[in-house]
A protein has these predicted regions:
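Membrane-interfacial terminal anchoring regions of lipid-handling membrane enzymes
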Residues: 1-856
Length: 856
């Protein structure tokens, strides 16, 4: 709900005043009542309301409409009333022979110059009708603009002209329209009957969207040298242009049909040249290569249908109400996306946590009147009927690997280039696949590189890259994720899986969160670094693509939401014991929450009532038996002796939610591990820094670090935090730089260190497995099974204390680290990977001992 403005002479919020002075048209009371009822559904975004209110405090507001329409004027009047923003008093730019009869000061005629000046001085509002095109001479509009310019030159305050788009729906314009849409689906520059039909057809999707306001006083000062005719032509064109930009930002560019899109690629001269060169190399006839290319394009290409979008809108609205408790969106960030989409093509790059992600952003953009992106989906989702539905909803499909598929790679690259040439917004997941662990997966930049190459080859002026965080209190795939982490092979998606998953509707999964990261405006990004794509060698471009992909991932991490379930999970997994007392768990949780608050990270809105939010998450953990409390361990209310039990097999699931926020703790966790691993009373800063660098290197395939930050500066910042809380003695800048643990500081450090110990156990286990295997070559899948069998035995014997350390993903990260250091080598035979010890066993033992030291 938008709070009303304070009543003032300049902005009247009393409905009786609005009724008296607002624009009234010569329509019947019945029609007026109908419009009022219809307009109750009109969406006027809160940020737009606030923007207009701010303008009205500085000067009078004039609403500018592109097409002359009595209906649109009524809609803007009602939207203004409902939003409690200035309501239009009269209308300008009417054709004399068809003018409505507004209730002006006299009650019958539009105000004369003196009356209009008086009205504007009181900061009353009006509607300015611009006509359909700035290229067409329109005496009535020009007369209205001349009058408005004259009034502005005699007013001390600026007059703000707010161009307004009246959107009757989100239907994209198609290059080849069907007859029904030509007759009944259009609403720009049409007569009253067809406009009314459009209103009835899209009544639930009406939106009033103000574009960027024009300060008329500043505009006249900037263009004072223009003649009157030039000024009128330019001003009218500017206002119409802003409405057109807003429309494209809302619905996107005009779409070609799928058939035309495919044929355009196949008939491209440069693509034919590529195929002829391939014909020479591979000795395949050109018609065969063309046939293969067409087959690939039919596999890849989307087949957008507005009907499916409208169906999804209804289905997803039901989903958010019945399975989730709503979607919490970053409205300021979305407003930024809208602003960028007015100026340049968009690439939206979210993280990937659930199959629902494919639909979520499109749903949010649809509701917020932002053009819908075309989403890159994995080929595993192309099975019927899901693939058909996704394709009709704007998805295009990509294979997991292009290896050995030169023609497919070229065709896919051409498809991306064609989309970029049409300024179609693209959405793809920077991690490639869904994260099975809850944390950000290392970014994949293959698709990003194709997009940036298309940007370069098409000579585009600019490109907006938008990182987006998507998070869930709980994901519906959690069970299958844990099975994969435990070593069960991933099954391909099937229609039967969708049917079986109907049982998810019997559960509640909390809230969904959408936060917008810092956009990368590519032209500005390159200029700031003095880089020019055309001047870069291929190796330099690859390094650039990789760097940008990591910056996208970092940006997503910075806006990831601390949810109650993530904080509850983190507090449970700091220790390796099966049981934990409520008081100890709550103390750890409060320690973590205090630290996160000091770092000003985003918290879920439910933390406004923190105790209630935590209790709610705890209840879910108990209800889902992720933790248990037996009768003997349940204390009477208020005694604080309740004991929670963590079943070993459930720790992997709890670990998933802990990992959602673990990146916020990395510097402090590494520091705590270093301090606790040493027996000295006073530890030199240099020793801590050495351990910190080692741990960053060890986990370079697990976590995304900001390489632009100085390691020592990060450590000092965390030491100052611990010292301020009384956990350690440390005086920054005072020699010698040493750290001494104070009082109960060891307990706090142990909590932070505990967040990383499952990863350390995983890596230690892999080094043990390599040592036991010696120089023997191991096939990857079989080796992973052996590591898990060994880990289960060590866990049973007590050598491994955390069941969550038996994670396939962690094993893979450890293997990549050992390959980086040259301790294991990788060979590929017939698309299978084989590993063997290739470094000195003593070097491997040294790493294993160093990891072990952090565990004890």
């Amino acid at each position: 709900m938008i709070p009303p403005c304070d009543p003032s002479p300049h902005h009247r919020s009393d409905d009786r005043v609005f009724q008296k002075s607002a624009l009234r048209l010569n329509v019947s009371p019945y029609f007026d009542g109908f419009i009022r009822k219809i307009s109750s559904r009109v969406r006027l975004a809160e940020e737009h309301v606030e923007a207009v209110k701010r303008l009205s405090l500085e000067g009078p507001v004039i609403y500018a409409l592109k097409n002359k329409s009595r209906l649109n004027r009524l809609l803007i009047r009602e939207a203004a009333r409902r939003g409690n923003i200035p309501v239009p008093f009269w209308s300008m730019g009417e054709d004399a022979s068809f003018a409505d009869l507004p209730a002006s000061v006299n009650g019958t005629q539009p105000p004369n110059g003196e009356e209009a000046a008086s009205i504007l001085a009181r900061r009353e509002s009006a509607v300015l009708q611009l006509g359909s095109s700035g290229l067409v001479h329109d005496p009535a509009v020009e007369e209205a603009l001349i009058g408005l310019i004259h009034l502005q030159r005699h007013l001390p305050d600026p007059v703000y002209i707010v161009p307004v788009l009246i959107s009757y729906g989100r239907r994209r314009d198609l290059q080849d329209e069907n007859l029904f849409n030509i007759l009944f689906g259009q609403f720009d520059d049409v007569g009253p009957v067809r406009r009314m039909i459009a209103l009835l057809r899209y009544a639930n999707k009406l939106a009033v969207i103000p574009a960027q306001a024009l300060n008329l006083k500043a505009y006249l000062a900037e263009h004072e040298r223009l003649s009157q005719d030039e000024l009128l032509w330019q001003l009218r064109g500017e206002l119409i242009g802003r409405i057109d930009e807003e429309r494209e930002a809302t619905v996107g560019p005009i779409l070609k049909s799928r058939h035309e899109f495919i044929e355009r690629i196949l008939q491209d001269v440069s693509f034919i040249g590529y195929l002829k060169a391939l014909e020479e190399r591979e000795k395949k006839p050109l018609p065969v290569l063309l046939k293969e290319s067409r087959r690939y394009l039919h596999e890849i290409a989307s087949d957008y249908s507005e009907t499916f979008i409208e169906l999804w809108e209804k289905l997803l609205t039901w989903l958010w109400k019945n399975i989730y408790d709503g979607v919490i969106v970053d409205r300021k960030g979305l407003a930024g996306i809208r602003e960028i989409s007015r100026q340049m093509p968009l690439v939206v790059v979210p993280c990937h946590r659930s199959h629902i992600d494919y639909l979520l952003l499109s749903y949010v953009f649809y509701k917020e009147n932002i053009q819908l992106p075309f989403v890159a989906a994995g080929i595993n989702l192309s099975f019927w009927p899901v693939g058909y539905i996704f394709r009709k909803s704007g998805a295009f499909f990509i294979r997991r690997s292009f290896k050995g598929l030169e023609l497919y790679g070229e065709v896919f690259s051409r498809y991306i280039k064609a989309m970029m040439a049409e300024k179609m917004p693209i959405e793809f997941f920077i991690e490639g696949g869904r994260s099975r662990t809850g944390k950000m997966v290392m970014p994949k930049y293959g698709l990003l590189s194709m997009i940036l190459r298309a940007y370069q080859e098409e000579g585009m002026k600019n490109l907006g890259i938008i990182p987006v965080y998507i998070g869930y209190d709980r994901v519906i795939e959690e069970k299958s994720y844990i099975q994969e982490l435990e070593g069960m092979p991933k099954r391909g998606e099937r229609t039967s899986d969708v049917i079986k998953n109907r049982k998810v509707i019997r559960k509640r999964y909390g809230q969904v969160y959408v936060n917008i990261g810092e956009p990368i405006i590519f032209k500005d990004y390159m200029e700031k670094r003095g880089l020019v794509l055309d001047a870069m060698e291929d190796r330099e471009r690859q390094a650039l693509y990789r760097k940008i992909s990591y910056e996208i991932a970092l940006s997503i991490n910075r806006v990831s939401v601390v949810t109650p379930s993530a904080l509850v999970a983190a507090a449970f997994l700091t220790q390796d014991r099966r049981e934990i007392r409520h008081d100890r768990w709550k103390a750890v949780l409060d320690t973590f929450r205090t630290y996160l608050a000091s770092r000003r990270v985003p918290f879920a809105a439910t933390f406004q009532e923190a105790d209630k939010a935590v209790s709610g998450a705890l209840d879910i953990f108990l209800r889902e038996q992720m933790i248990t409390v037996d009768d003997a361990g349940r204390a009477p209310s208020g005694q604080g002796e309740t004991i929670y039990t963590l079943p070993g097999e459930k720790r992997l699931l709890i670990d998933y939610y802990k990992n959602m926020i673990i990146h916020y703790f990395l510097p402090l966790s590494f520091l705590s591990l270093s301090v606790l691993s040493r027996k000295e009373d006073s530890l030199p800063l240099g020793v801590i820094l050495e351990d910190y660098v080692f741990l960053k290197k060890l986990f370079r395939h697990e976590f995304i670090f900001d390489e632009e930050k100085n390691d020592e500066d990060e450590i000092r910042e965390e030491l100052v935090y611990l010292a301020d809380r009384g956990h350690i003695d440390f005086e920054d800048g005072k020699a010698p730089q040493t750290v001494t643990v104070r009082g109960n500081g060891e307990e706090a450090l142990d909590a932070f260190a505990g967040l990383m110990r499952s990863y350390l156990e995983s890596y230690w286990l892999v080094t043990r497995s390599v040592s036991l295997a010696g120089k023997e070559e191991r096939e990857e899948k079989e080796w992973m099974k052996e590591i898990r069998r060994l880990g289960l035995q060590f866990h049973k014997d007590g050598e491994l204390r955390r069941y969550e350390s038996l994670s396939q993903q962690n094993f893979q990260g450890a293997i990549r680290f050992l390959a980086d250091t040259g301790l294991v080598s990788l060979t590929e035979k017939e698309a299978r990977k084989f590993y063997r010890l290739s470094g000195a066993p003593a070097s491997l033992d040294e790493i294993r001992r160093r990891i072990f030291r952090f565990l004890h």
